[in-house]
A protein has these predicted regions:
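Hydrophobic structural segments
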Residues: 1-177
Length: 177
């Protein structure tokens, strides 16, 4: 498999046409090497270059490649990078895969940045506040902050990548409990 085959798939998966050219991602460091082993990392770290060599990595997917020292990589290692498309598709925000895991339905866009959704509101199957907290902990392994709902049953949930006080109030005005 070649680097461009992987990026064609990821370009479609991440719907990169939604982003301006500088934010689309794709091939960060080109290569013609055939890819059998793809290394995945959020960003470069001190041991990355030895890891690439010891694991016989043919190409890297880096979420944040900016501190990558390409001179330390073995010759002809390709690098793929998707930052904003990754954040908006695979983390918090308008993430339909996450909505499926949380059993949310009737999704609505919640909040926008540069005409792109930064969050979602969805109907949750009626469940207790404790149950939804347990579900969130199971999916994410922890949560930064959570406050008890005024009602014992949770029916509507907001998921946002960068929740602010203003967005909390706006979510409440949309019936999020």
């Amino acid at each position: 498999m070649q680097l461009d085959t992987i990026t064609k798939f990821l370009n479609t998966f991440f719907q990169v046409e939604r982003y301006n050219e500088e934010e689309q991602g794709g091939i960060y460091l080109p290569s013609t090497r055939s890819i059998k082993r793809l290394g995945l990392a959020l960003e470069p770290w001190d041991g990355l270059y030895n890891w690439v060599k010891s694991q016989h990595i043919d190409a890297l997917f880096l979420h944040r490649p900016w501190k990558l020292d390409v001179e330390q990589l073995p010759p002809d290692i390709g690098v793929i990078s998707y930052h904003l498309p990754f954040d908006e598709s695979l983390t918090l925000g308008f993430n339909t895969r996450l909505a499926d895991v949380l059993s949310l339905s009737n999704l609505e866009v919640f909040g926008e940045k540069q005409n792109r959704p930064i969050g979602m509101i969805g109907q949750a199957p009626n469940q207790s506040f404790t149950n939804i907290c347990n579900c969130i902990k199971e999916v994410f392994n922890e949560y930064e902050q959570i406050r008890a709902a005024s009602e014992s049953e949770v029916k509507k949930v907001a998921v946002v990548g960068a929740m602010t006080d203003l967005l909390v109030r706006e979510a409440a005005s949309h019936g999020v409990n």
